[in-house]
Design a protein with these regions (language model features):
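Sec-dependent signal peptide recognition
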Residues: 2-12
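Alpha-helix initiation and N-capping motif
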Residues: 5-6, 59, 173-176
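C-terminal motif of bacterial Sec signal peptides marking the signal peptidase cleavage site
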Residues: 15-17
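Phosphate-group recognition and catalysis centered on beta-loop-alpha active-site segments
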Residues: 20, 88-354
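Mature extracellular/luminal domains of secreted and GPI-anchored eukaryotic proteins, especially small
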Residues: 19-91
Length: 354
């Protein structure tokens, strides 16, 4: 284990009151690990305490993995992630805490500053639109990703290019580089200088603690393909999020149950949510069965169902909510987050709450 990870374990153990009384007998695995992988004098004591106090099964699996792999921690990331989940220190836990800290509700800009429309000066899903949402007071943005012909995620809502760009055809039938040659249209149908964003570009403009809600799309019948794989895209998306280090401010969501199942299988510590156009008890039950962190229902969800979801340990982020009156209704229901085309209206309304 690295000095950083072992040091963090020691700090946690001291915080929890471990290491202050008579020491526990040294665990054989602690002896084996410390002899091979650490020169810290207190290593055996810290590892023994961790093995017996802090998520012992997950901790043992991690130390055993590192020891068995000649102290190469990089080969034990799954075991470390499982331990973080057990400890409540996974990215999903930090997202949950951040959302709860934004009460009475988090303000998430839908496709940035809203859908492409004559009244919206920015194209939907554009870097300018995402930037505008944050400037308007949004706590984060909601966006959609589709899969390209070379199995890469790209930011666009539709599975075709016709409505929002100067290109035509299915997104999944063009490569990432080909799609980057397309330009987004404004609400009047004029060609802008805005490209379809890469995910890293969005995180660059939506920076700091701002949240990014990624809805993972699956293509419709008109764009069905045997050459591209949703599973491949999801795995690449998850790897990309991990590589750039933004999981602690990322919400992953999908209408497709197989997608959110895959997310939890590949990254159980990431925050994910099941979307539904039909709110109700069945959605809540299914989200719990799928070990989701939240539901993303339409705003028609009842106050009783919001409370039932919260009682079940789920957060509730509703969509797409426009107009101050409808926004206030969602706040009164107790929802966790509101996805809106009008982040500036919601930002002002939230400042007026008691």
């Amino acid at each position: 284990m690295s000095m950083k990870r072992l040091g963090s374990l020691g700090a946690l153990l001291l915080l929890w009151g471990c290491g202050t009384d008579a020491p526990l007998p040294v665990e054989p695995l602690a002896e084996e690990y410390c002899a091979a992988c650490s020169g810290i004098a207190s290593c055996e004591r810290l590892v023994t305490d961790a093995l017996t106090v802090v998520c012992p099964d997950e901790t043992e699996a991690y130390y055993q993995c590192v020891t068995d792999n000649s102290c190469d921690e990089t080969r034990c990331s799954d075991q470390w992630a499982a331990r973080e989940v057990c400890m409540g220190n996974a990215p999903r836990d930090k997202v949950r805490v951040q959302l709860d800290g934004l009460r009475p509700a988090a303000n998430l800009g839908h496709r940035g500053s809203g859908e492409t429309d004559p009244d919206n000066p920015f194209p939907e899903s554009s870097l300018n639109g995402f930037t505008a949402a944050i400037i308007a007071g949004a706590d984060g943005v909601e966006l959609d990703v589709q899969i390209t012909a070379d199995n890469r995620p790209i930011v666009i809502h539709d599975d075709t290019l016709d409505r929002t760009t100067n290109c035509t055809g299915c997104v999944n039938q063009m490569t990432f580089d080909e799609l980057r040659l397309c330009r987004l249209l404004d609400g009047e149908g004029n060609i802008t200088d805005q490209k379809l964003p890469a995910l890293l570009e969005v995180y660059t403009v939506v920076s700091g603690d701002s949240l990014v809600n990624i809805e993972i799309k699956t293509f419709g019948d008109d764009c069905a393909s045997d050459t591209v794989s949703i599973e491949t895209m999801v795995v690449e998306l998850l790897d990309g999020i991990e590589t750039i280090g933004v999981a602690e401010r990322t919400i992953l969501s999908s209408l497709d149950e197989s997608v959110v199942e895959l997310i939890k299988r590949e990254r159980p510590g990431y925050y994910s949510a099941l979307i539904s156009e039909t709110p109700g008890s069945a959605l809540i039950e299914r989200a719990v069965e799928l070990a989701q962190d939240a539901i993303h229902p339409s705003y028609e969800i009842s106050a009783d169902d919001v409370q039932s979801a919260l009682d079940a340990g789920l957060q509730v982020n509703v969509w797409v909510v426009n107009g101050a009156e409808l926004m206030q209704q969602q706040i009164d229901k107790g929802v966790t987050g509101i996805i809106t085309d009008e982040p500036e209206v919601l930002a002002e309304l939230l400042t007026e709450q008691p």
